[in-house]
Amino acid sequence: MKRLLILSAACLLALPLSAQWMRQPTPNDTLQSTRTLPDGKVLFQIYAPEAQTVSVTGDLPWGNPVRFEKAENGVWKGLCDGLGEGVFRYSFVVDGVRVQDPKAPLSAEQASLLTVGEGYVKDVPHGAVAQRYYYSKNLKQMRRLHVWTPAGYEKTAGKLPVLYLIHGGGDNDASWPGVGAAGWILDNLLAEGKMVPMIVVMPNGTIPVQNEVPPFAEDMVSSIIPFIEANYNVLQDKDHRAVAGLSMGGMETMEVAFNHPEMFSYVWVLSSSLAPGQDPAAESARLKVKENARKMNAGFKALVFTQGGPTDIAYRNCENTRAQLKKDGLRFDYMENAQAGHSWATWRADLQTLAPTLFR
């Protein structure tokens, strides 16, 4: 009897300790923060019972904000229409504070990632995306870049051509392999026989100076290209080098290609122009376009400008740029691969169009 009483007392003493480990369940335990509904709309959800306001920001349709309502269980819900298929960055804004989705399975460096539809990840042989660090001679610092190598590269004896693919303003070298889905897009194109094997280098075009375009172009020539050619089994002549960039990266593309036409055969300028706010004639003269037009026309196998349709914020500037370059004797092609404005939906479509044309 005495032993039974001691055991009962021990069980009673343990109850408060057990209660500390057994928290009350909440709707957040099983919450799915994003759901694609049968009609194509996306439902955003976040558990924030004490919040006063919730919104969502990111690569979402402009002019049609997602409106959230709070349920009695503390879950805020909002419907987004018009996304289409693809990969999108988003963040919740809770009481004015931007927060990443704590339940997102994929995240970029500064935002969560949502995949609508099948996305780009398919059952095909996949290449590798590696982070590499190099020393920049002109910037005098260690810098990072990403490199995509095709499936089977490790066993390949032959040398491959190289595409240098540059992001836009406000992003970095993680953007193309992240929200740009570059690795997956390239995997699929190669598996479908739509492009030749190549290496794709995604450098960091962001430099903390007032005008980062010229120093980045110098970094490309003096450090990035030599680093790649010293560390990868690549062809090292202009016929097997391509450069492409979006928005700010498009300005960097023109800066390096127009100043060094002897280094590249393929040049793609995506949603970009000569420096905004500057006289196009003066910028073209600074880049010696008229002086070198004959050399570039003969040396470039492709010079292509693209836009995301009239809603692309670079649309008018690009029109002015093309008019000036044409006046200065430079030949180029122009296309609109997607009517998605100044967005990653446009630039992913550009990459899907661009890559199959290279090194043929």
For every predicted segment, state its role.
Residues 14-16:
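N-terminal signal peptide c-region/cleavage motif recognized by signal peptidases
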